[in-house]
Amino acid sequence: MNTSLKLSKQLSFGEEIANSVTHAVGAVIMLILLPISSTYSYETHGFLSSIGVSIFVISLFLMFLSSTIYHSMAYGSTHKYVLRIIDHSMIYVAIAGSYTPVVLTLMNNWFGYLIIAIQWGTTIFGILYKNFAKKVNEKFSLALYLIMGWLVLAIIPAIISQTTPIFWSLMVTGGLCYTVGAGFYAKKKPYFHMIWHLFILAASSLQYIAIVYFM
C-alpha cells in the first residue's frame, strides 16, 4: 500500500473541524435524498434511470462520508493515512458516478457505454495509483479528476439535443465549481481546503438538481 500520502501538510484543528463539518452535511443530505431520488427517477424515467441516479447519489454519499471521517482522524495516525487514500479515491468514484445516470437515461447506446467504460476505467486506475504508486504526484491526480470531469464535452451534443438549457447550464456550472475549487485545493493555504469542500458541495448540489429534476 502507498505510503507517500502520509507526508501531507498538517492542518490546524480548526481547519479539520471545518473540513469535517462541511462534508458531513453533504453526506447526511445525500443519505436522505437517496430513496427520494431513486423513486422519483423510476416514476419519471424508468428502471435504468433509477439505477443510474442511485449510483450517482451513492457515489456522492461515499465521497462525503470518507472525507468527513478522514478529516476527523488524528494527524499521523494509521487510520488517517488509510482514510486519506480512501478519501481521494472516492473523488474518482463520484465523478464517474455523475456520468452514469446521464448516459443510462440519455445515451443508451455504444458511445454512451464507451464513456461509462472510460470513466470507471479511469476510476479503477486512479484508485490503484493512489494505493500502489511509490510516490503519488498530487498534480497528476488532480489532472485526472479534471480530465474525467471535462470529458463531458464529448457528450454535449447528445445532452443539448435531449434536454433543456436548464439541465446543461446546471451541469456546466457544476463543472466550473469543481474546476475553480480545485485551484483552492492546489494552493494549500489556511482554510483553502474548506473552500474546496464548499465548491464541491455547490457543484454536487447543482448537478444533483440537474440530473434528478431536469434531465
Predicted regions and their residues:
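Multi-pass alpha-helical transmembrane bundles in non-GPCR membrane proteins
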Residues: M1-M215
